């Protein structure tokens, strides 16, 4: 939206102009490029998605984070479960595979929000390996939860930072309702 939706259109047009869109050859091989990207659930239109597919886009990673209304409201994503679901189906309809990034362990995560996520995954027919909410240095969460992080790491912030390489592993827990075991 910041580019008034012109950049992606221009990129797709250039891929066609330079003859880089995927085409199957007679021998069964392909020429051109398949590509992917990331997007926000609110920043697409069905028209631009179809244009992207026609230019070779095979999948889009969406930072949906959660399908829980109360979690989405508190993390300030600017999206809702409804916009997440709408973008999921619009992307599928355009012939692009939507890949949802999901996060568990938000500060206000609870059993209700976890159940809402599981229900959405089942309803949408998607398999998800969620990431854990992580207070990266420089983020608001790091500032807010620094004392808690230091306690969890026995005062050794360097060990916490070294643990940050894999977002599918639990580092410092920032959930108000669950501990690392739960």
Tell me the role of every PLM-derived stretch.
Residues 1-99, 104-106:
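Conserved SAM/AdoMet-binding glycine-rich loop
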Residues 112-182:
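C-terminal accessory regions of radical SAM enzymes
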Residues 44-46, 109, 137-139:
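Intrinsically disordered, low-complexity acidic/polar segments
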Residues 6, 111-112:
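Short N-terminal helix/helix-N-cap motif within the alpha/beta-hydrolase-1
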